[in-house]
Amino acid sequence: LAITLLAGLLLLAALVWTPAGNAVGKRIYDQLSIWIGFQASPDVVLVAIDERTRLALGGWPISRRHFATLMERLLQEDQAPRALGLDLLFTNTVPADEPLAEQMARLPVVLPKVMSQPLPLMQAPSAGQAWQWTPPALERAARGSGHIHVRFESDGIIRGVQTRLADQAHFSIAMLEVRTR
């Protein structure tokens, strides 16, 4: 029994402290994540634009009228989510901001934030670090915002996020906070 226990501890140490073991541990974690799965909440909606949709809507920039119409439909069909994340960066002011802001104010919208200047690797931002500008009408209409910075691991997979960056929670946490208000 002692030999089996010792062998198990040595194997665990190898998985934790060696590069090869770390790679095996990551694969185990990835596989367990797939097997366990994830059940999305039906009252949380994430709006993102895929390539097919981008082309169907005429390419970039996509008119903000489309997003306002989507929000109007969600309200008309009694399908208003408890959190609506717009995974889109709005970095300039356009005349369609006001109609979009009106629809946003009727829903629990969360906007993403990115740093205006990239940070050197491993450097933590300071409080008040400059975030990329968002049109004021949209900023006021949103119920929350969160950063969308991620760090890919050496194998190209994201296995975690920084829960807080300067004064911003991560986008997913901001959506959860808005959902539970």
Enumerate the predicted regions with their spans.
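Non-transmembrane functional regions of envelope-associated proteins
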Residues: L1-R181
